[in-house]
Amino acid sequence: MKPENKSPVLDLISAGMKTVVNTLQPDLPPWPATGTIAEQRQYYTLERRFWNAGAPEMATRAYMVPTKYGQVETRLFCPQPDSPATLFYLHGGGFILGNLDTHDRIMRLLASYSQCTVIGIDYTLSPEARFPQAIEEIVAACCYFHQQAEDYQINMSRIGFAGDSAGAMLALASALWLRDKQIDCGKIAGVLLWYGLYGLRDSVTRRLLGGVWDGLTQQDLQMYEEAYLSNDADRESPYYCLFNNDLTREVPPCFIAGAEFDPLLDDSRLLYQTLAAHQQPCEFKLYPGTLHAFLHYSRMMKTADEALRDGAQFFTAQL
């Protein structure tokens, strides 16, 4: 689409979202647009420090988990000793950015609001890791903690997956992987999905929205995909294009959150409509006035905190 025809998003977002967009960090260098991926990852981690401040304190433990690809770091957030379930969190970042530090506040709030143990999995980023390595690492971590639940003093009888953006795709893909391959890691009580991508190649929102403000132009989305996938055939894999999977049966209850001015919004809408059409348990909520990635900004933005509370409430209602 000709750029001039796109929606004037920055004029339409909420007052709270505008405050976030206009918040400056004076000691932060400019985004290294032409830098290496290592430099961009470093910048992303530095930029998120401000937004992660002031998160709830709780018992936190770090463990390295063995997988066939090597060791993967995990971080456990334990809000109480008698957790009713364990929720695995997969961070967003277009498959190429992000880590356990960039999403620390999100995981802490989710643990606090749900009173469940939250385990963040620092899956290997792309392009170093290609599909389906991240999913296989997530599944391996889930199996590891299921087998070692008593040693780690966690409740793995009921589990869930949660994620934002690319992490939302990984969350649902991992749940479907466990179902399809009949791997028992505990009952999957729910899946929490904030503004994910689930396999659409094109859509109204992908045409109308997306720009330099969110890093989600059509060119950006293509770049993330090319970094993540091994080959063209992977685009049709039921664990990348999740609409090619069987969404008519045994899908865990899904909380699907959409951001109003997110180019990926139609992915969330289609996922909800598909699940609902086949009587699969699901809930969709649209957060007005928001951009993609708004979940990070709960320090300043009430809507972000609300979205985390909504997800936590949905999950605990399934227990």
From Swiss-Prot:
Renumbered ranges of motif Involved in the stabilization of the negatively charged intermediate by the formation of the oxyanion hole: 91-93
Biological role: Displays esterase activity towards short chain fatty esters (acyl chain length of up to 8 carbons). Able to hydrolyze triacetylglycerol (triacetin) and tributyrylglycerol (tributyrin), but not trioleylglycerol (triolein) or cholesterol oleate. Negatively regulates MalT activity by antagonizing maltotriose binding. Inhibits MelA galactosidase activity.
Family, per entry: Belongs to the 'GDXG' lipolytic enzyme family.
InterPro entries cross-referenced by the UniProt entry: AB_hydrolase_3, AB_hydrolase_fold, Acetyl_esterase, GDXG_lipolytic_enzyme, Lipase_GDXG_HIS_AS, Lipase_GDXG_put_SER_AS
Primary location class: cytoplasm
Enzyme class: hydrolase
Entry EC no(s): 3.1.1.-
Gene Ontology CC annotations of this record: cytoplasm
Catalytic residue list: S165, D262, H292
Protein name per UniProt: Acetyl esterase
Domain of life according to the entry: Bacteria
SUPFAM superfamilies associated with the record: alpha/beta-Hydrolases
Entry GO MF terms: carboxylic ester hydrolase activity
Species the sequence originates in: Escherichia coli O9:H4 (strain HS)
Keyword Transport part of the UniProt annotation: no
Gene name tied to this protein: aes
HAMAP family documented for this protein: Acetyl_esterase
Subcellular localization(s) per the UniProt record: Cytoplasm
